[in-house]
């Protein structure tokens, strides 16, 4: 990457930080992590120049990276702290995984695609991030053997409340997932565990892919 590219990415990053602050995100730790993790490291070469654009970017295995502003709003809503254990369903490019790792104690991330899991591991190793556990499993099924978590982020959408995953939350834990019809508009929803009950708040509308059951046999 040339000096011109570096300067351009820095300008785009600074502009985005100002924009997100106008949306209510004003966490110094959050922006420090965002500046530390180069998003262009997580996109393929044809999309390198679009790394900081607010648009969907295709990745391997027919998957995609969500719009950048959506990613940042969701991660900010998790209110991550250094002591937290985080579970992510849907590793994807690994960009959000890396960001969360900078802001928490440990991130366990799972994906159904071997290719995405292996690529993510390589990227984390290159960046020197050591507090991420990457597993290739069927994320649509509850992973009780992993224990409880302070934060859970589920990228695939679903049509109903994620009750089985909510039970994995520790006290005062937060889970975020898009809830709504597979083929329609969904609502990114934030659940907070308070004792034996869960408070629910709606964030914004999206169109995310639903869960695909099973582990990919080829990719």
Where does each model-flagged region fall?
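Conserved nucleotide-cofactor-binding alpha/beta core module
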Residues: 79-199
């Amino acid at each position: 990457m040339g000096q011109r590219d570096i300067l351009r990415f820095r300008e785009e990053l600074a502009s985005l930080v100002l924009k997100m602050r106008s949306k209510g995100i004003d966490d110094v730790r959050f922006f420090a992590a965002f500046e530390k993790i180069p998003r262009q490291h997580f996109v393929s070469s044809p999309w390198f120049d679009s790394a900081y654009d607010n648009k969907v970017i295709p990745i391997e295995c027919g998957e995609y990276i969500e719009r950048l502003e959506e990613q940042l709003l969701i991660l900010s809503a998790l209110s991550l702290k250094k002591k937290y254990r985080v579970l992510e369903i849907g590793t994807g490019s690994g960009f959000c995984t890396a960001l969360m790792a900078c802001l928490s104690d440990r991130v366990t991330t799972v994906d159904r695609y071997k290719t995405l899991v292996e690529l993510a591991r390589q990227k984390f190793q290159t960046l020197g991030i050591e507090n991420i556990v990457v597993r290739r499993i069927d994320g649509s099924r509850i992973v009780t053997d992993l224990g409880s978590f302070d934060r859970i982020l589920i990228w695939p959408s679903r049509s109903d409340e994620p009750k089985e995953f909510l039970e994995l939350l520790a006290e005062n834990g937060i889970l975020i997932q898009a809830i709504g019809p597979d083929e329609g508009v969904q609502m990114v929803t934030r659940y907070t565990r308070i004792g034996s009950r869960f408070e629910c708040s709606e964030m914004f509308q999206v169109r995310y892919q639903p869960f695909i059951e099973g582990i990919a046999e080829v990719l």
